[in-house]
Regions:
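Catalytic nucleophile serine of serine hydrolases
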Residues: 331-332
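Flexible phosphate-sensing "switch/lid" loops adjacent to ATP/NTP-binding sites
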Residues: 1-319, 326, 343, 367, ...
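A conserved active-site-flanking secondary-structure segment within enzyme catalytic domains
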Residues: 338-390
């Protein structure tokens, strides 16, 4: 029998749609449902490569893990990776079809609906429930023509909708009631309930507020979910993680907060480790005296390299390396550490830029993107992180540029680089690095075990906060 859909929409970006969908995936899995996530179109710089070499958004990877499934590109058939404020690289079913301006994509997206529906139907044939995530708000009225991700998709699938609002940012009545009021009658009929998300304090104090929401919107409030902090990947660019500025206790890790920073989930193992603090640095005044400098991945290597130079951070990084402070580049950050980055075909912004000159390599962007999972053993390193020699790793690569043949991790003195995202996730990698920098010994817990424990905790919290029985009735009967 074909899967039944349920859709999570939100009043705005960062209302909590992604984690709500993940929580519902795990809660339904616990009850024996075969469940899969689906988001027709995702805009994100954080992405992932599946085992068969396709690129997709990390939010759907998190939801797939919560559902107990392997990541499948059909769960996110369209991924937009911003390259500028008005343009993105467009990825369809895991492969790039080129860069487009917002205007070009708006005209192009109507062609994508057949591919989106084919992906959805394939998942629906293999599962009992599909948990669909919308994007942004369903009432961006100027963008609703040819909608493929919110109510346009919900109507096509006759999917019941749960609408999530973020009370932490204020205006919950305007958010939820305003959104419901701006929907068409047909769209409004699909909304089966409201969820108040990120409530701080005693939830019982909102009981009267919930009644007011129901009276004003005509929709039942199916739950008030408390504000929580769990160790689960959060891909949204508004993530609070990026706001960390001050030095904490223990080993001080300074990650450069690049304008087009991607895959910042790479650094979660350092964030969760005791005896280590991670801060995200975007200006010289924040640089301080770190024990480790990390240049992260980016969707626009040359432009972000120019950002480091124009603001003076490049000088700080080079000076730190000359003082013996370890510097570690990942993917685009790795490319920046070399002598030169060239983009002759305009894959990102075009042109070329001198690198920081800390590693003996040059990067040239070709037309083909490298997308692959990878695993192996680290070897051949010298210096402070020679402790990683013999350490097994698994991860994935997503990059346009090629920098010649080299090992998974390379170094020159105290400067290190890798193309492998997720390399710090394996038990022992981050712990050994922290210990090498004089930090307290960290637990060698594998990141995957941490995730599994947190998915269970997420489902427990969700069940305690919502009317799960009513949600199941909505899924089963659409009421």
């Amino acid at each position: 029998m074909k899967a039944r859909p349920i859709m999570i929409q939100g009043t705005m970006s960062n209302a909590g749609k992604s984690l709500t969908a993940a929580a519902l995936c795990r809660a339904l899995k616990q009850e024996g449902y075969r469940v899969a996530p689906f988001k027709s179109q995702n805009m994100a710089l954080n992405s992932y490569v599946t085992k068969d070499g396709f690129e997709m958004g990390r939010a759907q990877v998190v939801q797939a893990e919560a559902a107990g499934k392997e990541a499948d590109v059909r769960m996110n058939p369209v991924l937009l990776k911003p390259t500028t404020d008005v343009g993105s690289q467009v990825i369809v079913l895991g492969k790039s079809v080129g860069n487009m301006s917002a205007r070009e994509y708006f005209a192009y997206k109507k062609q994508l609906f057949p591919a989106i529906m084919e992906a959805y139907e394939g998942l629906a044939a293999e599962n009992d429930v599909i948990v669909i995530e919308g994007a942004g708000s369903p009432v961006e009225l100027n963008l609703n023509d040819n909608d493929i991700v919110n109510m346009g998709l919900a109507e096509k699938l006759s999917a019941p909708v749960l609408l999530v609002g973020d009370i932490d940012r204020g205006g919950i009545f305007a958010q939820l009631c305003g959104t419901v009021s701006l929907l068409s009658d047909r769209e409004r009929a699909l909304v089966k309930g409201l969820l108040v998300n990120k409530f701080r304090g005693d939830v019982s104090l909102f009981a009267e507020g919930a009644k007011m929401l129901e009276r004003l919107s005509g929709k039942p409030v199916l739950g008030v979910v408390p504000y929580f902090s769990l160790d689960i990947d959060d891909e949204d660019s508004l993530s609070e993680r990026l706001s960390a500025k001050g030095r904490g206790e223990g080993v001080d890790v300074a990650v450069m907060r690049l304008p087009k920073l991607s895959n910042f989930t790479d650094f979660a193992p350092f964030e969760r480790a005791k005896g280590c603090s991670v801060r995200y640095v975007s200006r010289v005044s924040e640089f301080g005296a770190p024990d480790l400098v990390i240049l992260p991945g980016t969707k626009s290597t040359i432009e972000d390299l120019r950002f480091l130079k124009s603001g003076g951070l490049a000088e700080q990084i080079v000076a730190a390396a000359h003082r013996g402070v370890p510097v570690f580049g990942v993917c685009g950050g790795f490319q920046m550490l070399g002598k030169k980055v060239s983009d002759p075909f305009g894959c990102e912004c075009g042109g070329e830029e001198a690198g920081l000159g800390l590693l003996p390599l040059e990067t040239v962007f070709g037309r083909e993107k490298c997308l692959r999972e990878t695993q192996g053993t680290i070897g051949g390193l010298s210096g402070v992180f020679s402790c990683l020699n013999g350490q097994n790793y698994t991860g994935y690569e997503i990059h346009m540029g090629q920098s010649g043949e080299h090992a998974a991790v390379v170094n020159s003195g105290c400067v290190y680089g890798t193309y492998v995202h997720g390399i710090f996730d394996d038990a022992g990698v981050a712990a050994k690095m922290i210990a090498a920098l004089g930090g307290a010994p960290a637990e060698n817990e594998d990141a995957r075990a941490v995730k599994e424990r947190n998915y269970e905790e997420l489902a427990k919290l969700f069940r305690a906060s919502v009317d799960m029985q009513k949600i199941k009735e909505i899924i089963e009967h659409g009421i």
